[in-house]
């Protein structure tokens, strides 16, 4: 079995989800698209997110028969899943903040949701909290800065500690916060730095393993008509810029053969 799985995000944060899935399904055929023309998604309207999602999946599906799409972005997942599921027959898996496991594991029943502004403000997230964390205090930080800091770390290997510290400053003196939900696929890439800044927090929860298990379960239930043999893992971006060659090297380090421009304006 070698299913073709497309993952997409506005940046490279979705690679944390890809990595978790790859560990569960090492032999799958992977395609990854980062929509850098519209990065960061947290600053975009819901209509734009839906439009981009459909365009990206449609364009790649024309060239590569897909078995599954993983929306490897929390912000997009709170908006685009119904539209994608309506349009495409293959399974669509989203990424949502891990509120249920966080509520279960927290000993003080005080949880921090660290996500983008878009995710923090969505009614969908309020519903998840109401459903799974009714007995918890949920503190929220909505940040675009942290997404930018992670992209910078991916490109340069460095993190601006001062800017990072400012993002979570209000939690550094919180007396009872013991669990933090990494509610954006970028954030596990600075988990170590966050642990240093928030030493009282016992649990940092990200959705990677849960999504990997979900993907494996769904694929076992579907007949894979499009199973790929000996196909190369390829990455796509939606805008050519001065970072292209640097990004291609990064994607090759993550196991992708090459980086291609996905031209969404061409019919």
From Swiss-Prot:
SUPFAM superfamilies: Aspartate/glutamate racemase. Transmembrane segments: none annotated. Pathway: Cell wall biogenesis; peptidoglycan biosynthesis. Keywords: Cell shape, Cell wall biogenesis/degradation, Isomerase, Peptidoglycan synthesis. InterPro entries: Asp/Glu/hydantoin_racemase, Asp/Glu_race, Asp/Glu_racemase_AS_1, Asp/Glu_racemase_AS_2, Glu_race. GO terms for biological process: cell wall organization; peptidoglycan biosynthetic process; regulation of cell shape. The keyword Plastid does not apply. The active site is at 73 (proton donor/acceptor), 184 (proton donor/acceptor). It catalyses: L-glutamate = D-glutamate. Its EC number is 5.1.1.3. Substrate binds at residues 9-10, 41-42, 74-75, 185-186. PROSITE patterns: ASP_GLU_RACEMASE_1, ASP_GLU_RACEMASE_2. Belongs to the aspartate/glutamate racemases family. PANTHER family: GLUTAMATE RACEMASE. This is Glutamate racemase. It comes from Actinobacillus pleuropneumoniae serotype 7 (strain AP76). The gene is murI.
